[in-house]
């Protein structure tokens, strides 16, 4: 009897200990999980739930953006972004919601039309072997519908970030009737070099005219799927100059990697890395790698599209002024001012072309 009573007496203590252990374990696990996860907002960013909804107004009070506004009317840039159906909602949407808002015209070029996005269907397949076909048809599209609406024609990938104001400043030193194009200049394969596809490149109106003429006359052909090399070859054949896009301090403005790679990576530790043998201009590591008026970076994640947008257009250090703000060139003062065209053109498909280049 005493043994039974002893067991009964110990039962509440045992149950209490077990319950206490379970509660402690549950609370500890909950705290660990909570501390191991980023805040809710960041978890939403990682899940791509809030990114398209992020609004980034560029109005600041007080702020003088008169120079930028003036250049946007003198140096009009059409931006076309190479993308695909599977990338519209994962990559292209974040390009659309960030830097392309600073373009005079922004077009998203895909293999098929998406009227909701909207994206222009070029009637090509998908894959790396179709990149040059997309490029050929996209530039033909821009030539047919926008030749007289902008002076410059910029191509970018859907993971490229571009500071359009800096691009306009660089282009303001030139005129659109010059046969020239700019980008991150590589040197293999082509005598005058060619521009990296990932860092983006921009053609003058005259360069675009010559590109289209090259295909009309058969001087330029689709001979390789390597888009940037192929367009560089066509540019050289048509007498289009590979321009120097470095700033007045001889620092690079177009970049084929994200900012942190150029700022922190030691390219010199691996001289076998392809980048060493490709660059026309000397590679500079560290803070001097990049121009204060940098134009583009490649391999930018959706989150970093908005991060860069914030850093460039919103973040300020109190009490500091920009240490490098070059004036506009004399050429920029002589450029005509264009009145904004309110007419919105419908997105067309490749079928609207008159004898577009066809895949062989």
Swiss-Prot record:
Residues involved in Mn(2+) binding: 157, 159, 298
Glycosylation-annotated residues: 148, 173, 341, 347
Enzyme kind, highest EC tier: transferase
Catalytically driven reaction(s): an N-acetyl-alpha-D-galactosaminyl derivative + UDP-alpha-D-galactose = a beta-D-galactosyl-(1->3)-N-acetyl-alpha-D-galactosaminyl derivative + UDP + H(+)
The EC number(s) this enzyme carries: 2.4.1.122
Record family assignment: Belongs to the glycosyltransferase 31 family. Beta3-Gal-T subfamily.
Protein name: Glycoprotein-N-acetylgalactosamine 3-beta-galactosyltransferase 1
Annotated organism of origin: Xenopus laevis (African clawed frog)
Upper taxonomic lineage: Eukaryota, Metazoa, Chordata, Craniata, Vertebrata
């Amino acid at each position: 009897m005493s043994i039974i009573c002893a067991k009964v007496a110990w039962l509440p203590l045992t149950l209490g200990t077990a319950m206490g252990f379970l509660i402690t374990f549950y609370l500890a696990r909950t705290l660990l999980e909570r501390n191991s996860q980023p805040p809710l907002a960041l978890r939403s960013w990682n899940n791509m739930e809030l990114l398209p909804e992020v609004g980034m107004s560029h109005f600041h009070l007080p702020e003088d953006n008169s120079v930028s506004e003036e250049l946007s009317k003198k140096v009009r840039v059409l931006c076309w972004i190479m993308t695909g159906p599977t990338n519209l909602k994962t990559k292209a949407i974040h390009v659309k919601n960030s830097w392309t808002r600073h373009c005079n015209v922004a077009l998203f070029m895909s293999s098929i039309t998406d009227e909701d996005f909207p994206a222009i269907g070029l009637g090509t397949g998908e894959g790396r072997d179709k990149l040059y076909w997309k490029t050929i048809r996209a530039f033909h599209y821009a030539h047919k519908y926008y030749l007289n609406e902008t002076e410059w024609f910029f191509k970018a990938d859907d993971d490229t970030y571009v500071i359009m104001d800096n691009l306009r400043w660089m282009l303001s030193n030139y005129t659109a009737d010059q046969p020239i194009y700019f980008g991150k200049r590589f040197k293999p394969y082509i005598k005058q070099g060619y521009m990296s596809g990932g860092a983006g490149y921009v053609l003058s109106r005259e360069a675009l005219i010559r590109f289209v003429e090259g295909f009309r006359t058969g001087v330029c052909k689709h001979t390789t799927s390597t888009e940037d090399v192929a367009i560089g070859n066509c540019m050289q054949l048509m007498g289009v100059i590979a321009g120097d896009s470095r700033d007045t301090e001889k620092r690079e403005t177009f970049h084929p990697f994200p900012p942190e790679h150029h700022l922190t990576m030691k390219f010199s530790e691996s001289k076998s890395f392809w980048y060493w043998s490709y660059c026309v201009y000397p590679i500079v590591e560290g803070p001097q790698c990049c121009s204060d008026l940098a134009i583009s970076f490649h391999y930018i994640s959706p989150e970093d599209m908005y991060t860069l947008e914030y850093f460039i257009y919103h973040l300020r250090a109190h009490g500091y002024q920009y240490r490098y703000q070059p004036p506009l060139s004399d050429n920029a003062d002589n450029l005509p001012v264009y009145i904004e065209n309110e007419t919105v053109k419908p997105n067309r498909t490749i079928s609207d072309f008159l004898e577009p280049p066809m895949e062989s």
